[in-house]
Amino acid sequence: MSRRPKSARRGHQGAPVTSQSFLSPAKWHRSRIVIGVGNQMAEQQIRFDDGASYEQMMGIWSRSAGEIFLDWLAPPLGLRWIDIGCGNGAFTELLVERCSPAEVQGIDPSEEQLAFARTRPASRLAKFHQGDAMALPFADSSFDAAVMALVLVFVPDPAKGVSEMVRVVVPGGAVVTYMWDMWGGRSPLDPIHSEIQAMGIVPTRPPRMDASRMEALRDLWIGAGLEDVQTREITVHRTFANFDDFWRTNIKSPALRPTVAAMKSGDVETLISRVRARLPADADGRITYGARAHAVRGRRPK
């Protein structure tokens, strides 16, 4: 039976399901960034307020990386999961499809993203709630596994976010994440971000990009007292029908929209030309390129 989160935390009944191989502020999704060209400065925000557009832009990437991530985790069936920063439910859908969970609770600060998540088939099992990654509205030891999928760099205090993940899992429970390698310039949007920076413009980026480094993830997990900490790289590729398909899809990004909207039309045309040259098409006009994610897993000590 599913549970609604409560402000006053209560205990949760039910024996944890384990497997040795698997277990061996409220607006944190909005990043306030100052961008500027020359003497012109403007504050921009990353606002995740359109679940459908986000699905078109990031859905394929997220699913591709999430499939590999779950292959690596190899979780047993029937676990109680919490998906923190579930967004529009892309990874939650994978959990329901592949892991036959006993329960899934999705938490995200964006009601617009959650509205999209509730339209997915996964909503027949998963329950979605508005909430804060740094103050999860669940009792201690409520879940067998806690996951953040492509989220950690948006949490203002990553260590606090990880400590909350640890708190809500049972002793021996799994704490896992994967995050695009933004620090290393290997996120799906980096072909555009790199050219924006080359033009002398500071793009809108998440507040804690440093948390995407593999070393940072390992340090966060070890610092949280987790055991059996392991890491791995995940590399995925995506193909677009042509450059126009690539541009129309990626400009839906909540990180790119405010930056490009603040640019002069001539600068936008220059940016498009630079990105087009950076991503040569094949003989049929298709654009294919890759992105890299860093993943980490650990378990709460028994």
Where are the regions that the model predicts?
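Conserved alpha-helix/loop element of class I SAM-dependent methyltransferases that forms part
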Residues: 60-79, 94, 98
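A short acidic, Gly/Pro-enriched loop at the edge of an enzyme's catalytic core
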Residues: 134-145
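Conserved Class I S-adenosyl-L-methionine
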Residues: 43-47, 88-90, 209-302
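A short SAM/SAH-binding and catalytic strip from SAM-dependent methyltransferases
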Residues: 144-158, 181
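Class I SAM-dependent methyltransferase SAM/SAH-binding core
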Residues: 80-136, 160
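Conserved catalytic/acceptor-binding region of the Class I
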Residues: 159-160, 166-241, 257-260
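N-terminal, positively charged/glycine-rich alpha-helical extensions of SAM-dependent methyltransferases
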Residues: 28-52
